[in-house]
Amino acid sequence: MLKIKKLTVQYGPLPAINEISLEIKHGEIISLLGPNGAGKTTLLLTLSGILKTTEGRIIFEGEDITNLSPHQIVSRGIGHVPQGRHIFPTLSVIDNLMMGAYLHRNEKKEIKKELDSIYQLLPILKERIHQRAGTLSGGEQQMLSIGRAMMGHPKLLMLDEPSLGLAPRLMDEVFATFREMNQKGLTLFIVEQEILLSLSISERGYLLRNGRLIKEGSASTLMESRELITSLGEYPPY
């Protein structure tokens, strides 16, 4: 589905990511792990078209999408839930969701279909449809951010630190939603500091350090990996 070939991104004196190669297959949940500053967010921003590559190629479903614009990336079927959610707090839930439907803004039937699908998956959003987004709880705001990305009807959804700022109970709810999304056919690429939580729903994972890929393997292999423990110091509590 997605192949990254020797990707380098540099926007300072040193590469933020350096000759990274990885692959994501249809229907997988993949974790991208590493300490702060490893290059995880940079990789997602590059895949989203927000940052430009210095070298390397990005292939999605057989098409070279290297350095396409963000809206072109979305139109190909890649969604991105950024770190920090970035919702519009003064707008209602439905208005925030509609922000994600700009590619289908003239297709009312398609928009209704997507909304119905999102309300089925995330029923709390339907209950809060006219509520201002800024008054939602942290977990509800995360669900809204996910729902907005889903309005673009992605085939691959990338999530950057989805557990950030959430209580453990809410983390479990959010990650249970990810499992359900995956069971419905969506491929997920998750950047997450809650290592055990992320690996618990993933088939495979990749470990970055200082912009380089240093380890890849099954979730069970990574859980026992000396490289993972060394990179992060210790497993985060969960």
Residue ranges and their predicted role:
Residues 56-63, 76, 110-115:
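Conserved ABC transporter NBD signature motif
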Residues 48:
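Helix-to-loop junction immediately C-terminal to a conserved catalytic motif
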Residues 33-35:
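The feature captures the beta-strand-to-loop junction immediately N-terminal to the Walker
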Residues 120, 204-216, 220-238:
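C-terminal boundary and immediately downstream tail of ABC-type ATPase nucleotide-binding domains
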Residues 149-150:
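ABC ATPase C-loop
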Residues 12, 30, 93-111, 121-123, ...:
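ABC-type ATPase nucleotide-binding domains, specifically the catalytic core motifs of the NBD
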Residues 132-136:
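Conserved ABC ATPase signature
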